[in-house]
UniProtKB/Swiss-Prot annotation:
Source organism, top-level taxon: Bacteria
Gene assigned in the entry: minE
Lineage of the species this protein comes from: Bacteria, Pseudomonadati, Pseudomonadota, Betaproteobacteria, Burkholderiales
One Pfam family from the record: MinE
Protein name, UniProt field: Cell division topological specificity factor
Organism of provenance: Burkholderia cenocepacia (strain ATCC BAA-245 / DSM 16553 / LMG 16656 / NCTC 13227 / J2315 / CF5610) (Burkholderia cepacia (strain J2315))
GO terms under biological process: cell division; regulation of division septum assembly
Length: 84
Protein backbone atom coordinates (compact mmCIF):
# COMPACT_ATOMS: atom_id res chain seq x y z
CA UNK A 1 0.00 0.00 0.00
CA UNK A 2 1.47 3.33 -0.98
CA UNK A 3 1.46 6.34 1.31
CA UNK A 4 -0.75 8.29 -1.08
CA UNK A 5 -3.44 5.61 -1.19
CA UNK A 6 -3.24 5.31 2.59
CA UNK A 7 -3.72 9.04 3.12
CA UNK A 8 -6.43 9.51 0.52
CA UNK A 9 -8.18 6.26 1.21
CA UNK A 10 -8.81 3.59 -1.34
CA UNK A 11 -12.24 2.44 -2.45
CA UNK A 12 -12.77 -1.29 -2.48
CA UNK A 13 -14.06 -2.83 -5.68
CA UNK A 14 -17.49 -4.42 -5.58
CA UNK A 15 -16.04 -7.85 -6.40
CA UNK A 16 -13.75 -7.82 -3.37
CA UNK A 17 -16.58 -6.61 -1.12
CA UNK A 18 -18.85 -9.38 -2.41
CA UNK A 19 -16.10 -11.96 -1.87
CA UNK A 20 -15.59 -10.80 1.72
CA UNK A 21 -19.33 -10.98 2.40
CA UNK A 22 -19.55 -14.52 1.03
CA UNK A 23 -16.56 -15.59 3.13
CA UNK A 24 -18.15 -14.13 6.27
CA UNK A 25 -21.49 -15.79 5.60
CA UNK A 26 -19.94 -19.20 5.00
CA UNK A 27 -17.64 -18.91 8.03
CA UNK A 28 -20.60 -17.88 10.19
CA UNK A 29 -22.64 -20.87 9.02
CA UNK A 30 -19.78 -23.30 9.65
CA UNK A 31 -19.31 -22.10 13.21
CA UNK A 32 -23.02 -22.13 13.97
CA UNK A 33 -23.56 -25.71 12.86
CA UNK A 34 -27.20 -24.95 12.14
CA UNK A 35 -29.25 -25.11 8.96
CA UNK A 36 -28.55 -22.31 6.49
CA UNK A 37 -30.15 -18.98 7.23
CA UNK A 38 -32.53 -17.43 4.79
CA UNK A 39 -29.87 -15.10 3.40
CA UNK A 40 -29.76 -16.84 0.02
CA UNK A 41 -32.66 -14.85 -1.52
CA UNK A 42 -31.04 -11.59 -0.36
CA UNK A 43 -27.69 -12.74 -1.75
CA UNK A 44 -29.35 -13.59 -5.06
CA UNK A 45 -31.00 -10.15 -5.19
CA UNK A 46 -27.67 -8.39 -4.54
CA UNK A 47 -25.91 -10.47 -7.19
CA UNK A 48 -28.59 -9.58 -9.75
CA UNK A 49 -28.19 -5.89 -8.88
CA UNK A 50 -24.40 -6.00 -9.33
CA UNK A 51 -24.45 -8.04 -12.55
CA UNK A 52 -27.25 -5.88 -13.99
CA UNK A 53 -24.83 -2.95 -14.03
CA UNK A 54 -22.97 -4.70 -16.85
CA UNK A 55 -25.42 -7.17 -18.45
CA UNK A 56 -29.23 -7.22 -18.60
CA UNK A 57 -30.44 -10.19 -16.51
CA UNK A 58 -33.53 -10.96 -14.46
CA UNK A 59 -34.03 -12.79 -11.16
CA UNK A 60 -34.84 -15.95 -13.12
CA UNK A 61 -31.39 -15.92 -14.76
CA UNK A 62 -29.52 -16.60 -11.51
CA UNK A 63 -29.66 -19.53 -9.11
CA UNK A 64 -27.97 -19.62 -5.70
CA UNK A 65 -27.80 -22.77 -3.59
CA UNK A 66 -25.92 -24.00 -0.54
CA UNK A 67 -25.30 -27.72 -0.16
CA UNK A 68 -23.78 -29.56 2.79
CA UNK A 69 -22.03 -32.89 2.48
CA UNK A 70 -20.36 -34.19 5.62
CA UNK A 71 -18.05 -31.36 6.75
CA UNK A 72 -18.03 -29.60 3.37
CA UNK A 73 -20.26 -26.71 2.32
CA UNK A 74 -20.64 -25.72 -1.32
CA UNK A 75 -22.11 -22.38 -2.32
CA UNK A 76 -23.13 -22.68 -5.95
CA UNK A 77 -24.05 -19.69 -8.10
CA UNK A 78 -25.33 -20.30 -11.63
CA UNK A 79 -25.80 -17.27 -13.86
CA UNK A 80 -27.39 -17.45 -17.28
CA UNK A 81 -26.02 -14.57 -19.36
CA UNK A 82 -27.83 -13.79 -22.61
CA UNK A 83 -25.94 -13.88 -25.91
CA UNK A 84 -24.65 -10.50 -27.08
Amino acid sequence: MSILSFLLGEKKKSASVAKERLQLIIAHERVGGRPPADYLPALQKELVAVISKYVHISNDDIRVSLERQDDLEVLEVKIEIPQA
